[in-house]
């Protein structure tokens, strides 16, 4: 027969299990804020999209356990009342509310929630090029807040420059060496082009294999996040 202490232990274990399940099934809050002097049309997969004038914010709740997700900013957009239109950079199939990834060049805030080791993984990426400065800011002050604050467009070489952004070398030249694929999938080094990005934004991914200095973690369930354009 179970004793009172046995029942108490079972009750505590049950409450812990329920709490962990609720935490995993809950949502993580992201707040996107535009501090740029121009309008940014924020986008997220998941999330959709929202026009943000200077100083405006957009709250987005993302299910815990979401993997391979991203936020980005679009510029030079024009949409009609139905939410159809075009953007100069970051366009997502001509939709205000994005259901697909944005076109290059685009600065990305990438993340995975509740990944390996019960950690959130996040990074600022210039692998798809650069269009808007941004930062990822965990509300947990013990976790690092990576940022790309520089105007990379000002340092963009002519071969990579487009209206409103700076393409990656992979996008422009489509070689295995620049794209870290084929014969270079396991042997990919920084290029003179990716080093321009790295020098401007040391905390951001500058090419596909730039993991060691550009991926950050925070214990899952301990934080929400803000994404700031022009931090």
From Swiss-Prot:
A matching Pfam family: Thaumatin
Entry-linked SMART domains: THN
Residues annotated as signal peptide: 1-27
Record's function text: May be involved in disease resistance.
Intrachain S-S bonds: 36-230, 77-87, 92-98, 143-218, 148-201, 156-166, 170-179, 180-188
Organism: Cryptomeria japonica (Japanese cedar)
InterPro entries in alphabetical order: Osmotin/thaumatin-like_sf, Thaumatin, Thaumatin_CS
Keywords: Allergen, Disulfide bond, Pathogenesis-related protein, Plant defense, Signal, Stress response
Cross-referenced PROSITE patterns: THAUMATIN_1, THAUMATIN_2
Family statement: Belongs to the thaumatin family.
Protein's UniProt name: Pathogenesis-related thaumatin-like protein 3.7
Presence of keyword Lipoprotein: no
UniProt cross-references to PANTHER family, sorted A to Z: OS03G0233200 PROTEIN (PTHR31048)
Keyword Disulfide bond in record: yes
GO biological process, one term: defense response
């Amino acid at each position: 027969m179970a004793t009172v202490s046995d029942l108490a232990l079972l009750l505590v274990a049950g409450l812990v299990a329920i709490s962990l399940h609720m935490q995993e099934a809950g949502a993580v809050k992201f707040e996107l804020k535009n501090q740029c002097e121009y309008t940014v049309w924020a986008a997220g997969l998941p999330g959709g999209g929202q026009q943000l004038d200077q100083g405006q914010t957009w709250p987005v709740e993302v299910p815990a356990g979401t993997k391979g997700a991203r936020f980005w900013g679009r510029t030079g957009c024009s949409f009609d009342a139905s939410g159809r239109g075009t953007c100069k950079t970051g366009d997502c199939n001509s939709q205000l509310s994005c259901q697909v990834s944005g076109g290059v060049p685009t600065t990305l805030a990438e993340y995975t929630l509740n990944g390996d080791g019960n950690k959130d993984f996040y990074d600022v990426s210039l692998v798809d090029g650069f269009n808007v400065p941004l930062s990822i800011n965990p509300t947990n002050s013990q976790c690092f807040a990576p940022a790309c604050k520089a105007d990379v467009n000002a340092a963009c070489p002519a071969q990579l420059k487009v209206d409103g952004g700076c393409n990656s070398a992979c996008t422009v030249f489509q070689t295995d060496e620049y794209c870290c694929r084929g014969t270079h999938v396991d042997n990919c080094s920084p290029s003179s082009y990716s080093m321009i990005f790295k020098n401007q934004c040391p905390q951001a991914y500058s090419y596909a294999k730039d993991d060691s200095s550009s991926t950050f973690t925070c214990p899952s369930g301990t934080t929400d996040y803000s994404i700031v354009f022009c931090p």
